[in-house]
Structures are given as C-alpha cells and as structure tokens.
Amino acid sequence: MILSFVFGLLLMTTQQVNTQDHLEITKDGHTVTNINRLDFSFPYTDLPIIDSNKYNQFLDKLDKQFSVEPKNASFDQHGQIIAEQAGYRIHRQSFTEQYYAYYFSQQQSKLEIPMLSVYPKVDSELLGAIRSIRIGRYVTTFNSHNKKRSTNIQLAAEAINNYVVFPGEGFSFNKVVGKRTTAKGYLRAPVIVKGEFSEDIGGGICQVSSTLYNAVDNAGLKIVQRFSHSRKVPYIPPGRDATVSWYGPDFEFKNMYNQPVLIQAKTLGNLLIIKVYSSDSIEYIPRKIPSF
C-alpha cells in the first residue's frame, strides 16, 4: 500500500490513469484475462494509486486457479517408493514487479504469469531412510461384513497412511483426515453419542484413531490430547480408546524425537494394522501397550 502510494506521488505530476489500454494476462501463451488500470485503482481520483486489497484478491484468485500442490513421496501397496512431485504457485513478487511496470508506464502490454516451484517436504531419499526400523505397532479387528463401517475405516486409514511427522511437529487426527463427508466416500454407520448408539457420517473412524493412539503410544511418542468414549468399545481394551469428532474431541500427539516418524496404516481382511517407523539413528523409548 505504501509502495504504491509513493509511486503514485512520484508520477502524479506527469501521468494520469489511462482507462483505454489494458494488460493481457497469459499462461503458457494462452490468454487468461484482460485487466485495466481502473480495475485496481482507487476510485474518484486520476492519480495512479493501486488499491492493494483489490490487487491481492486478484492475485489470490489467479494463484488458486493455477497453483499445483506438491506431492510427498509415498509407498505403494507393494512397499515400493512412489517418487515425490514438485508443485507450482504464482511468483507473486515477479508478477507484481511486472504489473507495476505496466501500471505506471501508460503502455498496452502483456504479462505471462511467472510460476515458482514448490517442493514437497518428503522426498524419496528421506522416506527410504525413515522406514529403517519399526518403533511402534498396533492391530485391531473389525467386522468386515459391515460394509459401511468397513468403508469408513478404510478411508480414514488411507488418509493417515504414509504421513510423516517431523521432529517437534504435532499430529492432529482431525486435521490430517479432514472432515468426514459423503463427497469423500464416507457413509452413515453406528457412532456413540453421550453414551448412546446412533448413526452418523463416518461412523467407525474412532477405531482408526484408537488404533493409531496405541501404535504411537507404543512408539513412545508424546500424547497431547486424547479422550475416551462415553461407553466401552469392543475393539480395544478399556481406557485405551481415542474418540474423535469433527466438531468435538480430537486425538493429537507430538514427535519429540530427533528423527521424523512415518505412519503406515492399512486394512487387511478384518484387521486394521498401524505401524510407526523411523530411521536407525532415532533415540526412542518404547512403551508396553496392553492388547486383547
């Protein structure tokens, strides 16, 4: 805001906003849109002063349209590493410099959207290194004939599978799995609400959060937040469950170790298996976890 105001003051004696010319915005040589100086100028003035709020909203819209999220390296179902993929976002500084040159030049022009590479946090080398040793594990069983509940368990397990928690980082089950919706494939299945059985979208995912809790507890990771159900659940020993709800309780832990940890989760028949891995240089203290 201050920068655009200063530019305006410097040029106000020699320049007024030309409303006839335009700037052609292109991507890979194809026209995306055409904009005029008035689109981002303060109204009721002939001075060339940019409205930074409008301009930034325009950049945000372009960024949302053309940005590509990076993809971390991961393991496939056969244990082979799938290489990482770089992402891209608009190079806002370069775009702004070119836009300012147009805005204060009184010339019709064209601007090719500059892109900036965004690299994933987890590459193939790191992923391979942190699967050296297993530091935690837990297995629970479920009724695979209950298709709706089984579907929810599988979807939640896939959401946390291959997730890497770096040293000092926290893990939130709700943030990683996201909101459970029908658009994501979640189905209505039994849940426990205030001690009573009911049905809701995503019923069954608490088995995933509970199995994860025991796996990371077995690995000696720091438990930050955990709540038990209001009644006993059949798939875990008493007091070893971790209930979650999008608008309610969450399960959280933190990696206090000196190395990243890798979560691997999968369903196999009627088994939900969650393992925690890290590099062979990790200094960890495992905990003994009760099982059925």
Question: Which role does the model predict for each range below?
Answer:
Residues 2-3, 7-292:
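Surface-exposed, secretory/extracytoplasmic low-complexity segments enriched in Ser/Thr/Asn/Gly/Pro
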